[in-house]
UniProtKB/Swiss-Prot annotation:
Disulfide bonds: none annotated. The gene is CHMP1. It comes from Oryza sativa subsp. japonica. PANTHER family: CHARGED MULTIVESICULAR BODY PROTEIN. It is a peripheral membrane protein. The keyword Membrane applies. Involved in ESCRT-dependent multivesicular body (MVB) formation and sorting of endosomal cargo proteins into MVBs. It is found in: Cytoplasm; Endosome membrane. This is ESCRT-related protein CHMP1. GO terms for biological process: endosome transport via multivesicular body sorting pathway; late endosome to vacuole transport; protein transport. It comes from the Eukaryota. Belongs to the SNF7 family.
Length: 205
């Protein structure tokens, strides 16, 4: 990634991808709300089988929503790292000019010019350090997101409670639906691993 223009192109592409992931996250969030509304209507009609199907759909959309947000967050962290590297390359290129300016100021005894040059140089590195700290915080924060494991039964009960509805048919124990939730979590982990590999390949390109 020694070519600055190529690096900037990669940064632009990753930012675009991150925005696309965020749009997909919003879409999934909207679809989750639609499915929860269908749960409400099905419960009102006493259609518990239908309510269960809609609840499963809502949970799947919620999981997809969180996965998209997680991927977008991780991409943003990669972009921050690449952006920092790009700025370091710019500083590296200007290093020769700064050293030359300092030598000139020292030779002529112009302490004011030397001080101004150092102020400018140090300011660039302060900005770099702030950005690096922000990037590290984003990287750490992205790992705190976890895939929801809300059970179908609890979601149905939540919708019923929100709308003051009585669940006319007894709901089975949540344990009966633990396996689908586990599969959703396993799928999320697989997607995380894939996204990490894609980000690494793109960063090396």
């Amino acid at each position: 990634m020694g070519n600055p223009e190529k690096l900037m192109t990669q940064i632009f592409d990753l930012k675009f991808t991150s925005k696309s992931l965020q749009r997909q996250a919003r879409k999934c969030e909207k679809e989750e709300k639609e499915q929860k509304l269908k749960v409400k209507k099905a419960i009102e009609k006493g259609n518990m089988d239908g309510a269960r199907i809609y609840a499963e759909n809502a949970i799947r959309k919620r999981t997809e929503h969180m996965n998209y947000l997680r991927l977008a967050s991780r991409l943003d962290a990669v972009v921050a790292r690449l952006d920092t590297q790009a700025k370091m390359q710019v500083i590296g290129k200007s290093m020769a000019n700064i050293v030359k300016s300092l030598d000139s100021a020292l030779a002529t005894g112009n302490l004011q010019k030397m001080s101004e040059t150092m102020d400018n140089f140090e300011r660039q590195f302060v900005n770099m350090e702030v950005q690096a700290e922000f990037m590290e915080g984003a990287m750490a924060g992205s790992t705190s997101l976890s895939t929801p494991e809300t059970e179908v039964n609890s979601l149905m009960q939540q919708v019923a409670d929100d709308y003051g509805l009585e669940v006319s048919v007894g709901l089975p124990q949540a344990a009966a639906h633990a396996i689908p939730a586990a599969k959703e979590k396993e799928k999320a982990v697989d997607e995380d691993d894939l996204s990490r590999r894609l980000a690494e390949l793109k960063a090396r390109g």
